Design a protein with these regions (language model features):
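Broad hydrophobic/π-residue packing in well-ordered secondary structure
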Residues: 8, 37, 130-131, 176
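Active-site acidic/histidine proton-transfer and metal-coordination neighborhood
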Residues: 2-7, 13-124
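Active-site flanking residues adjacent to catalytic metal/cofactor-binding acidic residues
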Residues: 92, 125-130, 156-157
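Gly/Pro-rich active-site loop or hairpin
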Residues: 64, 102-110, 131-177
Length: 177
């Protein structure tokens, strides 16, 4: 078995306006097919987790219908979840900004929690310690997710506000303990 499978729905130019949040249904279907292919790889590799991070969002007010994008995301995540075999999990990661700066479709842990709950029982939230607003209490987020049985895992890095993916403990070694 290997670790989690991380589908890439952001690098290809077809995703420049998003993947699951894209207003073009053909693009959303392509992203869904990529998820299904990733699940097939996950099953073949005997991996437990499908780890999802989306770059989807917008850079300027009025350029995206945020409610439609939320609905499309919910539909696509539900369709992805429906393809999971028993004992497999789908982890939904959030990020408040970057690459989009006006809005990201799954911007914080609350949005990820709602999306995961709407997706199905095998969906959980993935906490990346570099994906938070200034002064946000990550320990409190983890406690809430644990209490709701919705904590799926972590991506640890030591750059809390800009996601530079620094090695855990490189800035503040005491935070590891």
């Amino acid at each position: 078995a290997i670790g989690s499978i991380n589908p890439n729905t952001f690098q290809d130019q077809i995703y420049k306006y998003g993947s699951f949040g894209n207003p073009n249904e053909e693009v959303r279907q392509r992203a869904l097919q990529h998820m299904f292919d990733s699940i097939a790889i996950m099953n073949a590799a005997n991996s437990r987790d499908l780890s999802l991070w989306f770059a989807d969002g917008s850079n300027h007010p009025g350029t995206a219908n945020i409610r439609h994008r939320k609905q499309w995301f919910t539909e696509c995540l539900q369709a992805t979840h429906a393809q999971l075999q028993p004992e497999k999990r789908m982890l939904v990661e959030y990020k408040p900004f970057e690459p989009a700066f006006y809005h990201t479709d799954i911007a914080d842990w609350g949005m990820a929690l709602l999306m995961a709950k709407a997706s199905g029982p095998a969906a959980k939230v993935l906490v990346d310690t570099g994906h938070h607003y200034h002064a946000q209490n990550i320990e409190q987020i983890v406690a809430w997710l644990l209490d709701e049985d919705m904590l799926g895992g972590f991506h640890f890095n030591d750059r809390r506000y800009a996601d530079d993916d620094l090695t855990l403990g490189s800035i503040d070694p005491y935070q590891v303990f």
